[in-house]
A protein has these predicted regions:
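Acidic, mature catalytic/reactive cores of soluble proteins
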Residues: 1-539
Length: 539
């Protein structure tokens, strides 16, 4: 993160905003000098989240019980891989023994040095058995990472809580209740903790004549001084990253994207021509709402911008939905990586409706996995890259193009949906995995079910590539699901976000006005279901 900010500092900007394209060799922006509204909006939300995340790390315990759960999850992955190997009985028994030992240590250890040291020995025994086995590279990689993880845990304890090392057991026994609890050690109070420990050790040493005890006390005092320096350095680095994120976000001027006449955000700004683009973002279910919300929270654009974003409602199977431009999962759920989908709000119900329609779409296509969104497909551009397009579900989309009838499933869409429908999403992931869509770096970018792009006799073609932004969205969604809405919580911890949050609580309308039905009908003239049912209450 520090190196990323160092690079960003060297990149030319326009009114604090990053250009759309840069040379990775020179960091000079490419022509045309275009500044993207949505990309900078996503960056703004990410910067605020990062800032609060750094401050949260300073305030939270250095050692947490989730460390044991993380190692247990790691061992579970190893066990699953070993179970899939032929003739793996010996390794299966070895990993089972390791799991049993881990459970025993986690129950009674409270993250002590001794517990991790014991786990290190147990891991080494497992690695010895693995070395003599015909296990594949993937198992060996995960096993190597387990060893590194345990060693890093031991190093962290030595760095931040040196009194837990076995050579200081006699000092600990003599100090008794004055030994700090590791669960209470935080970077924000580490100086006080180390000073208190130092005072207790000096007092102990002043009442002892035993040479061994004095030597141990002297060494521990030296280690405490080192620990205080490490903690101070880490605290300072986290604060510097938080400050860098805040500074970069503060420099971003979103008023440059605002069209005063239409009271909307333009697609972007042409810095070469010195004007905003002629196209605008005018739909609420879109990536643009992150930029709109961020600009409103920042105070650089008026709140009315939010209410200028279109909300076009319809009905499918007698249930309400909110139309997007392309019908992608991305349009409904990507902003939820940061913003909370408040229960029964317009955005929450619109997102759930989109998931429902997407699942129904996959069911109608023969029960294939669901999750349609912008992604690569099994077609190549002139320069040999996979074609990228905003694939969507027709029943959710206002817009239709030559790709509207294509069926391309993007696994990252399921991870986005997991934030609202976790059980259904996990079942879908299991189906995708069973079909062979999981590769070395996670799920492949897409699976293409479009007839003209698949080989004879095949049901689909896997698009064997990974895209950084889809992987990033996947990781953030996982963090929200597994870590108590971590990214959403951090984003909303910013005072500006909290002040603007009320727009996210907007409720669905009780009925759809006639003018809105006319607009929808103009885009979707053949959709008789929507045309007939749209006049009914949406709530």
């Amino acid at each position: 993160t520090e190196k990323t900010f160092e690079t960003i500092d060297r990149m030319p900007k326009y009114k604090g905003q990053l250009y759309n394209w840069y040379s990775t060799h020179t960091l000079k922006p490419y022509e045309p000098l275009f500044v993207s509204t949505v990309d900078n909006g996503n960056l703004l939300c990410s910067l605020w989240t990062l800032k609060e995340g750094c401050r949260e790390m300073i305030a939270q315990p250095v050692f947490r019980s989730v460390a044991w759960q993380a190692i247990a999850d790691h061992v579970d992955v190893l066990a699953e891989l070993i179970a899939a190997e032929p003739e793996s009985e010996e390794l299966t028994a070895a990993i089972y023994d390791l799991k049993q030992r881990l459970e025993m240590l986690a129950c009674g250890a409270n993250d002590t040095f001794e517990a991790f040291a014991t786990l290190e020995v147990d891991t080494a025994i497992f690695l010895e058995k693995l070395a003599d086995s015909p296990a594949g590279n993937e198992i060996r990689w995960w096993a190597g990472e387990l060893e590194c993880r345990v060693k890093r845990s031991i190093a962290s304890i030595a760095d931040f809580a040196p009194w837990l090392r076995p050579e200081y057991s006699a000092v600990r026994d003599q100090l008794g209740s004055r030994v700090p609890r590791v669960s209470g050690l935080r970077l924000e109070n580490s100086s006080k903790t180390y000073a208190s420990m130092e005072s207790a050790i000096r007092q102990l040493a002043s009442h002892s004549d035993a040479p061994d005890a004095l030597r141990s006390a002297t060494r521990l005092l030296s280690d405490l001084e080192r620990s205080a320096g490490i903690a101070q350095d880490l605290r300072d680095r986290l604060n510097r990253v938080a400050d860098a994120a805040e500074s970069l976000a503060d420099d971003m001027d979103f008023s440059m994207f605002f069209d005063d006449k239409r009271e909307m955000l333009a697609i972007g700004y042409d810095a070469g021509a010195g004007c905003i683009s002629k196209w605008h973002y005018d739909l609420l279910p879109s990536e643009a709402r992150s930029a709109a919300f961020g600009g409103i929270a920042q105070g650089s654009i008026p709140q009315k911008t939010w209410f200028q974003l279109g909300r076009f409602h319809g009905m499918q199977n007698r249930k309400p939905l909110l139309y997007s431009w392309s019908g992608t999962m991305f349009e409904y759920l990507m902003p939820c990586l940061w913003t909370k989908p408040h229960r029964n709000s317009l955005l929450e119900r619109g997102a759930r409706a989109a998931i429902r329609v997407q699942r129904k779409f996959a069911e109608e296509k023969g029960g294939i996995p669901w999750g349609v969104s912008e992604c690569a497909c099994n077609e190549y551009t002139q320069d040999g890259h996979y074609l990228y397009h905003a694939f969507g579900v027709p029943k959710l989309a206002l817009h239709r193009d030559e790709y509207s009838n294509d069926v391309v499933i993007a696994p990252y869409a399921t991870f986005l949906a997991m934030m609202l429908e976790p059980a259904a999403a996990v079942r879908n992931m299991e189906n995708m995995k069973a079909l062979g869509w999981l590769g070395t770096y996670g799920f492949y970018d897409a699976a293409d079910f479009t007839d003209r792009r698949i080989g004879r006799g095949k049901q689909h073609e896997i698009v064997r590539t990974w895209m950084a932004h889809h992987q990033g969205m996947t990781f953030v969604a996982i963090a929200n699901v597994l870590c108590d809405s971590a990214m959403q919580r951090r984003f909303h911890a910013d005072s500006r976000v909290a002040a603007a949050e009320r727009v996210l609580h907007e409720v669905p309308p009780r009925a759809i006005p006639a003018w809105e039905r006319e607009i929808v009908a103009a885009f979707r003239p053949a959709d008789s279901d929507s045309a007939t049912d749209a006049a009914k209450p949406a709530a």
